[in-house]
Amino acid sequence: MRYFRLLVLGNGISAYGSYLNMVALNVFVYDATGSALAAGLFMAVRLATNVVSGWVSGRLVSVYDRKRLMVGADLCQALALLSLLLAPDGMRVGLLYALAVITGGCSTLSQVSLRSSIPEIVGAEHRVRANGLLVTGRSLAMIAGFASSGLVVVKLGYSAAFALDAATFLVSATVLFLLPVRTKAAAAGTGSAESSDAARWTARMLLGTAPVLMAMIAVRAVDGLGSSSHNVALPIYSSGLDPDHPATFISQFWATWAIGNIVAQQVIGRVTKKSGRTPGERAFALGACVMSAGFIVVFCGLPTVPAVIAALIAGAADGFTEIIYVSRLQTAPDEQRGRLFGLSASAENTGFGLGMLVSGALLEAFSPLQVVAAFHGLAIALCLALLLVLLRRGGTRDPGVEDKTVDRDASTVTEGRG
């Protein structure tokens, strides 16, 4: 865990760059072209790349060294941003769409590589704690990135924003390169052909041997729909609350959400350390229900204090479910883990991208509460169905998953206890 904390720091710095990049580039596209269509197309290209790169990333991390992939992904993003920074003004617009492909693909590759590597970096018994640290780091990076992006662009300009963004990726790549960590399991004596076959059939095998795990991935995809709905609806809702200061509620919401994430990391880390067991699929389904319900309550027009409390609960449940979900996928054998996280990334990005399009259209005719309730209500319904199936299957089985159940030599993914 000593080296992993440095890795979390580097990952948090690059995550800050990603969120700064997300805001600065979208605004730059609109300012440079004067076209909302061009800005929307830029976002669509990036989201589509995120979806496709999930499948590609799963293949890459199953074959190549993950540390090198993460370093390469950070360097590619830094070089792409520096190219945009140094390009003449007349060429920048054309480079933007190439940049959307590079940043979208590299960010997904980096995420899939890191999540697949955690059991090898820290050991399977420490994966829950490690996932919690990553969730906390990225939550803080998101708040810092969104909060500072406007200030950086307004006060320093786009060139400074792109330079700062590139610097964060260079720092992250340097930290990763220098850390003496192993990101892939030692090669087994059965040869690479068998390992490749195991990875190739992961998705098909999951349908037959781990339907609950596939259901969890489906829940995460629908959660992506819900997440996109409250992201799109939040500025509209905030403007309705205070037209003169719409950013006030947005800042309160995201700051409280981040605090909830940190609380979740602390709680689940202590519970796991004390009990020696990781909350399983049932806890995941229940936590996802609480998360979606919390987001719905935020948009119910409550006074500030109850709304902030709802955001805190939603943030805690969000962090809780993400830690459980990632930790559960990490119980898969190393040669299959990359494909599994690639599939998960594609599903989550598909849900989020589709939700951005649909919720944006629905908000033209319906209120923020109606749209958010519809999308998160769908997630709640799916989670309740999953919870019912788990309860029927589980009977009197223990609801936790022991950390020691990870078998590095296993050849198939099996269901854990929920």
Regions found by a protein language model. Name each.
Residues 1-418:
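Alpha-helical transmembrane-bundle signature of multi-pass membrane transport and export proteins
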